[in-house]
């Protein structure tokens, strides 16, 4: 399918909007009241530090709502204001933050139901309004909604759209797209739908496996089993790795994405030589600025003498998980929570370790003076960060020494 042509036709339709409806000022006032925080602004103005009693907070210098997230949420608010009576749906969570998604539900925005792992679009009728979230939506979903005669409000982050353009270039030049991402993440599902032939690698270990296969060959059945949920239909590693281009899920760990890109560049250079390798390899520049800034900020934060780290964001948020990884790699006790409600009485905290289910840890705040590093994912409002910080102050001051 010519996805580029379909996208162009859709964007020229009267039933498509990606610029909002002219209610930006009113919407931003509402979002400021609901999501911004005077306390967080105070901490910013105090060199990203705040001390009360025995607790000193060190806040990362880049954290929380990114421009793409703020834009998506604002467009969703505008959509409800512009269509006060119409049925409004969204194809997925607008962003990976439970409080924001719950706010949309309170505004009577319906979430497309999922049955046996498949979205049930039969609930959508002609004339309904359907929001595409910040992660985007697959080509097939857009086709379904377009065929139904829906008003489509597209809040896809421009950085995600940039990746789509990259994989479409790969497809046009008959290159396989190697996508650094999570095959079941909404963004990567959407990106792969715009690609031709593709392979999704989760991490550097998987990338090294593929690079070794490119250079030395291997067991095709083993390869296909290893990547059974992460490649295009009919993918053949013996045929489809001669010409490759690199793309990424925008929320992956920047350093790993860059390392994977360099790995494949060196692999193709080694296999095809300096004259021909450029025909076989397409480089990329699709690392999201906001993701990079937040990761750079936590790399700086973990240099401080921290007692512990609190990382705030949705548990299904990829960019938040990678912030957690950075702290753990520095051997800093780190707690990933999605709201202040996870901080429990009795010096207990309910949190999500990397790759594991929620657990409760006792005595997580040490006695005496402590320095707490705080950061949050790109989908986390400042108001949520404020609530977490205030609860840390309150619970620490209530602890009885001894």
Curated annotation (Swiss-Prot):
Pathway: Isoprenoid biosynthesis; dimethylallyl diphosphate biosynthesis; dimethylallyl diphosphate from (2E)-4-hydroxy-3-methylbutenyl diphosphate: step 1/1; Isoprenoid biosynthesis; isopentenyl diphosphate biosynthesis via DXP pathway; isopentenyl diphosphate from 1-deoxy-D-xylulose 5-phosphate: step 6/6. [4Fe-4S] cluster binds at residues 66, 157, 288. Isopentenyl diphosphate binds at residues 96, 185, 317-319, 379. GO terms for molecular function: 4 iron, 4 sulfur cluster binding; 4-hydroxy-3-methylbut-2-enyl diphosphate reductase activity; metal ion binding. Dimethylallyl diphosphate binds at residues 96, 185, 317-319, 379. Gene3D superfamilies: 3.40.50.11270, 4-hydroxy-3-methylbut-2-enyl diphosphate reductase, catalytic domain (3.40.1010.20). Keywords: 4Fe-4S, Iron, Iron-sulfur, Isoprene biosynthesis, Metal-binding, Oxidoreductase. Its EC number is 1.17.7.4. Its cofactor is [4Fe-4S] cluster. (2E)-4-hydroxy-3-methylbut-2-enyl diphosphate binds at residues 96, 185, 250, 317-319, 379. Pfam families: LYTB. Binds 1 [4Fe-4S] cluster per subunit. InterPro entries: LytB/IspH (IPR003451). GO terms for biological process: dimethylallyl diphosphate biosynthetic process; isopentenyl diphosphate biosynthetic process, methylerythritol 4-phosphate pathway; terpenoid biosynthetic process. It catalyses: isopentenyl diphosphate + 2 oxidized [2Fe-2S]-[ferredoxin] + H2O = (2E)-4-hydroxy-3-methylbut-2-enyl diphosphate + 2 reduced [2Fe-2S]-[ferredoxin] + 2 H(+); dimethylallyl diphosphate + 2 oxidized [2Fe-2S]-[ferredoxin] + H2O = (2E)-4-hydroxy-3-methylbut-2-enyl diphosphate + 2 reduced [2Fe-2S]-[ferredoxin] + 2 H(+). Catalyzes the conversion of 1-hydroxy-2-methyl-2-(E)-butenyl 4-diphosphate (HMBPP) into a mixture of isopentenyl diphosphate (IPP) and dimethylallyl diphosphate (DMAPP). Acts in the terminal step of the DOXP/MEP pathway for isoprenoid precursor biosynthesis. PANTHER family: 4-HYDROXY-3-METHYLBUT-2-ENYL DIPHOSPHATE REDUCTASE, CHLOROPLASTIC. Belongs to the IspH family. This is 4-hydroxy-3-methylbut-2-enyl diphosphate reductase. It comes from Microcystis aeruginosa (strain NIES-843 / IAM M-2473). The lineage of its organism: Bacteria, Bacillati, Cyanobacteriota, Cyanophyceae, Oscillatoriophycideae.
């Amino acid at each position: 399918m010519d996805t580029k042509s379909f996208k162009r036709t859709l964007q020229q339709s009267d039933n498509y909007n990606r610029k909002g409806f002219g209610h930006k000022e009113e919407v931003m006032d509402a979002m400021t009241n609901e999501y911004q925080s005077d306390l967080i602004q105070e901490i910013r103005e105090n060199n990203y530090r705040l001390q009360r009693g025995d607790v000193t907070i060190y806040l990362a210098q880049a954290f929380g709502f990114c421009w793409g997230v703020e834009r998506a949420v604002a467009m969703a608010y505008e959509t409800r204001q512009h269509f006060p009576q119409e049925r409004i749906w969204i194809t997925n969570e607008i962003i990976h933050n439970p409080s924001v998604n719950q706010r949309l539900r309170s505004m009577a925005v319906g979430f497309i139901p999922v049955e046996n792992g498949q979205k049930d679009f039969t609930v959508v009728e002609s004339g309904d309004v359907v929001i595409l979230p910040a992660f985007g939506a697959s080509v097939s979903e857009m086709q379904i909604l377009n065929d139904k005669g829906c008003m489509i409000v597209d809040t896809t982050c421009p950085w995600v759209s940039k990746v789509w353009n990259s994989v479409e270039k790969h497809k046009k030049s008959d290159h396989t797209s190697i996508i650094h991402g999570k095959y079941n993440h909404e963004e990567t599902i959407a990106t792969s739908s715009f690609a031709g032939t593709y392979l999704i690698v989760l991490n550097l270990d998987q990338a090294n496996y593929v690079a070794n296969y490119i250079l030395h060959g291997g067991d095709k059945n083993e390869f296909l089993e290893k990547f059974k949920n992460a490649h295009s239909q009919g993918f053949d590693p013996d045929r489809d790795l001669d010409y490759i281009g690199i793309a990424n899920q925008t929320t992956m760990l920047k350093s790993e994405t860059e390392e994977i890109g360099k790995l494949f560049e060196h692999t193709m250079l080694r296999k095809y030589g300096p004259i021909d390798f450029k025909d076989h390899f397409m480089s990329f520049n699709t690392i999201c600025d906001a993701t990079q800034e937040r990761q750079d900020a936590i790399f700086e934060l973990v240099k401080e003498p921290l007692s512990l780290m609190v990382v705030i964001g949705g548990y299904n948020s990829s960019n938040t998980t990678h912030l957690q990884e950075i702290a753990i790699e520095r051997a800093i006790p780190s707690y990933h929570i999605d709201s202040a409600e996870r901080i429990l009485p009795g010096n207990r905290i309910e949190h999500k370790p990397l790759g594991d289910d929620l657990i409760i840890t006792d005595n997580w705040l040490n006695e005496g003076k402590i320095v707490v590093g705080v950061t949050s994912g790109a989908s986390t409002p400042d108001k949520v960060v404020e609530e977490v910080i205030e609860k840390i102050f309150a619970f620490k001051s209530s602890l009885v020494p001894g």
